[in-house]
Every structure is written in structure tokens, then in C-alpha cells.
Amino acid sequence: MNQRTVEILDTTLRDGVQAAGVIFSLEDKLKLVRALDKLGVSYIEAGNPFSNPKDAELFRFAREKLHLKNARLAAFGMTRRGGMRAEDDAGLRALLESGAHIACIVGKASISQARDVVGVAPEENLAMIEDTARFLTENGMSVFFDAEHFFDGYREDPAYALSTLEAAARGGATRLALCDTNGGTLPSAIHEVVHKVAARFSVPVAIHCHNDAGLATAGTLAAVEAGAMQVQGTINGYGERCGNANLCEVLPDLELKMGLRALPEGNLSLLCDTARFISELANLNMDESMPYVGRNAFAHKGGMHIDGVLKRRDSFEHIDPKLVGNRRRLLISEVAGRSALLTRLKKVAPELTRESEATIRI
């Protein structure tokens, strides 16, 4: 039986830059794109060419000089404005001129958000979504529709939330991304809704979670279990407020826990180096207790734990750290015990044993 593959859309350059303190120069962005391509993600959402001149320059450079092996660049934009034809919308024109073959378009999936925030009638919001998807599709772009506030909108008015997806699909969208924009939806609710949407639509479903309730990774995995075939997230979980789904957690969970293919074979071992490289580009300290990629993820301090993990790795390690490019650390402390000390000593004196006089004396 063939291994199920999950698409990965990295949005570090779009959603990630909304995190407090994260600023990338154009050179940084190009380095980040190359690092993500080397890691092997499917898509890189590289920014908004209409609202950010730096992003427009990135797409110009990519069009002329950037040759990617694994990833495809996507440009981010909004639906057409209310009361305007799609062909007259400057933001949509910028997407076409970016040279990107994929447009990630965000539109409101909540009836109250459409009415109270965008200021348009619910019917006009649906027309904006459909017109935008159709215009871009007819001009040669693939459209990924980001249904903003989808889970909140579904709780509020399920029929209307689903109608926004129907509008996108009628316009030719090739992915329907369900967004937990406020980051407060429980994984069980995400599973239930994604299952219903995936069963209803022939267009593949994607999941886009924020971490405001500490549930972004769990919600993402629940969505994949329910039928989502694309995951959207950021390296190190960078994103506005509390961040986005952290691909440094999601990627190994998908591959090592769920048995799915998310990256080219063997590329998961690049994850730790990629996470550190991007944290350096962002000028942010790495969270050393981050699962999988932090220096402390496989650090052992207690004497009994060190003794146990040296005898059997799975005593206190849920995976081999090498699978994600990390390594085990045995910490010397007042609670470390003889096993930790001996392991460190044997690096310089291989002949020592637990019973050696020098070991006992130390």
C-alpha cells in the first residue's frame, strides 16, 4: 500500500513575519526560501507583492534567478474589494504580475466578519470570493483559498461558512484551507468539521491553525486524521500573537508518529539545522526546550534516567534524536549519578569502568 503524502505549505515569510520582533531583510528572505526548499516543503508562501515592496522584489528575483528543487512559491493576497470588478483590483493585478503560479487568497468565512469587519453584505462576500478565484484561475494561476475564521464562522452559521467554500470551488480554487484564525478551537471540533468538509468537497482540504490556546499542533494533526491533505504552518511556530502551527513539531509528528510522508525521504534529519538557521535569520533566541529540535529535547540530568537511557534508548526518549538532526545530551550535575559521569569520562579515558578507582574517587 502506498504511503499517504501530506502537502506542507510553509508560511514563515507571510504569517511568521507577523510575530513580534521578527524582521527579515530581502537577503534573509532569499536565504530562508533556499533553506525551506532544501528541507523539502511543498509550497512556500513568500509574502504579499501588493502591500510589501520587499515581497514584490522577492518575487521579481525569484522569477529571474531563483531555481528551486522541491518547493513552489505562492503569493498571498486578498479577495477583490467590495463593489469592484476583479480585473480592476490592484491587489489582484499585483498577484498576476508577481510571476508566482499559485495565489493564496484570504476571504471571510464568517457571516459576522463579512458584515461587521469587511463591511459588505453576506452575498457580496460570496461574490468577492468566487470572482477572485475565477479571475486568477482564468489568468493562469492556481488558487488556494484561505477561509479565514472558518471554525468560528462554522459555529456561528454552518451553512454560510460552507457557502464560502462552495464559492471558492465554483471559481476554480484547488485547495480549501480551513483557518482556526483565533486559535481557540479544540482538536475534537476541528476533527469533526474537517471530516464533514472533506466528505462534501472534491477539492482537497488544508488546515491552518494558530496557537492561542496551545492547540495548534494538536488541531493540525486532528485535521489530517480527518482528511486534510495540506498542512500550513511556520518554522519554530513564528506568527502573530501566540504563533502558528509549529512545523518543527508537526513534521516529525506526521512522519514518525502517523506514518505519513511530509518531506522527501531522509530530509526530516535536516529539521534541527533548519530551525536553528531560521532563528538566526530572525535574530531570535531558539527555544531550547522546543520538542524535537531544542537542545534540551533529548537532554538527561537525573542519574536513574541517564542510566536507563544508556541501557535502552526508549527508556526516556520517544524517538532517536538523529531522525530530526538532534543529539542526546547527558548533563553533569549533583543528581546525575555515576553513569553520566562515566560516559563523559570515557570520552577522554576509554579504559575506565564503573569499578575503576578513579571513577569511584571522582
Question: Where do the model's predicted regions map?
Answer:
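Metal-centered catalytic cores of metalloenzymes
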Residues: M1-N2, L165, E192-A199, L221-V224, ...
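Alpha/beta enzyme core
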Residues: Q3-I8, D15-I44, S51, F61-L68, ...
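A mid-to-C-terminal "edge-of-domain" accessory segment
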Residues: T5-V6, T12, P252, M258-I362
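Hydrophobic alpha-helical scaffolding
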Residues: V22, N48-N52, R81, P122, ...
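A glycine-rich helix N-cap at a beta->alpha junction
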Residues: K69-F76
